């Protein structure tokens, strides 16, 4: 006959009950409706008892059986906030979501080991001391240079001036191999002819990105930043002007600060 206590015995037991003649149903009530097995009625094998497999809510059933079994609630998700990480739980290596490697395949050297400190990544719910160091690369520091002009990029040390609106520019970052954005002004695109590419100059993100002779000034009223009237627009018209080898200045309309068509001033009828 199993032992029992008054806390779990049914009303069938009188006040003058003894351990030897207590009904067996008093000591083994259903686990779902009973308060919980006490130290007297706790089974020897805690794993086989449903009371020791409680849900993730704090349960009084986990008082005397933590040494012989591991509750199922102690296996929470990796990075989800779980209310069941008590002392009976085995430490789990919780890897933050934000600390996943994002380096490109061909530039693995740009990665740096992170210690998953709170300042490393933003908005992470799992930055505990059990984190394994991973390669944490800022999102904003990816190369965006064109394929044919890789020299226009400058190496940056991921300082606040490197990229804008980055969630990963904290103090835990040691300078890494961070290829900056290829800063190419919209209005300073090469306008050289196809035969004279040598007049163009690569841009290094400075205001003076092109040579004066190569890059025409942009119109102050143009929103498209197109160059002002190129000399190619002032070709002579053979029926009224000089030969193609040398044309007269009066045959071409002067460059206009508001004209984007750059048509010649003269026409066959005008000459």
Swiss-Prot record:
Region described as 22 X 5 AA repeats of C-C-X(3): 26-255
- Molecular function terms from GO: identical protein binding
The residue spans of each sequence repeat are 26-30, 51-55, 73-77, 78-82, 88-92, 93-97, 98-102, 110-114, 120-124, 130-134, 135-139, 140-144, 152-156, 162-166, 177-181, 187-191, 199-203, 209-213, 214-218, 233-237, 240-244, 251-255
Q: Which InterPro entries match?
A: KAP (IPR002494)
Per UniProt, the keywords (alphabetical) are: Keratin, Repeat
Taken from the UniProt entry, a GO cellular component term is: keratin filament
Q: Which Pfam families match?
A: Keratin_B2_2 (PF13885)
Tissue expression profile of the protein: Restricted to a narrow region of the hair fiber cuticle, lying approximately 20 cell layers above the apex of the dermal papilla of the hair root; not detected in any other tissues.
Assembly and interaction partners: Interacts with hair keratins.
Task: Give the protein's function.
Answer: In the hair cortex, hair keratin intermediate filaments are embedded in an interfilamentous matrix, consisting of hair keratin-associated proteins (KRTAP), which are essential for the formation of a rigid and resistant hair shaft through their extensive disulfide bond cross-linking with abundant cysteine residues of hair keratins. The matrix proteins include the high-sulfur and high-glycine-tyrosine keratins.
The family annotation for this protein states: Belongs to the KRTAP type 10 family.
Give the protein name, as stated in the record.
Keratin-associated protein 10-5
The organism named in the record is Homo sapiens
Q: Which gene encodes it?
A: KRTAP10-5
């Amino acid at each position: 006959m199993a032992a029992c206590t008054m806390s779990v015995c049914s009303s069938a037991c009188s006040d003058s009950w003894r351990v030897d003649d207590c009904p067996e149903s008093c000591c083994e009530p259903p686990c779902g409706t009973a308060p919980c097995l006490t130290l007297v009625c706790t089974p020897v094998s805690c794993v086989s008892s449903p009371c020791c497999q409680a849900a993730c809510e704090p349960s009084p059933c986990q008082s005397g059986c933590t040494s012989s079994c591991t509750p199922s609630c102690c296996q929470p998700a990796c990075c989800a906030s779980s209310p069941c990480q008590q002392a009976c739980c085995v430490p789990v290596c919780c890897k933050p979501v934000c600390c996943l490697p994002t380096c490109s395949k061909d530039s693995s050297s740009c990665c740096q080991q992170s210690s998953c400190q709170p300042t490393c990544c933003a908005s992470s719910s799992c930055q505990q001391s059990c984190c394994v160091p991973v390669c944490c690369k800022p999102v904003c520091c990816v190369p965006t240079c064109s394929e044919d002009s890789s020299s226009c990029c400058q190496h940056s040390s991921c300082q606040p001036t490197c990229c804008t609106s980055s969630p990963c520019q904290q103090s835990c970052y040691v300078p890494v191999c961070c290829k900056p954005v290829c800063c190419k002004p919209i209005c300073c695109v090469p306008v050289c002819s196809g035969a004279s590419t040598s007049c163009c100059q690569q841009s290094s993100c400075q205001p003076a990105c092109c040579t004066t002779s190569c890059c025409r000034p942009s119109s102050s009223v143009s929103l498209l930043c197109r160059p002002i009237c190129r000399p190619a627009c002032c070709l002579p018209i053979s029926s009224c002007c000089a030969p193609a080898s040398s044309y007269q200045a009066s045959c071409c309309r002067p460059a206009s600060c508001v004209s984007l068509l750059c048509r010649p001033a003269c026409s066959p009828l005008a000459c």
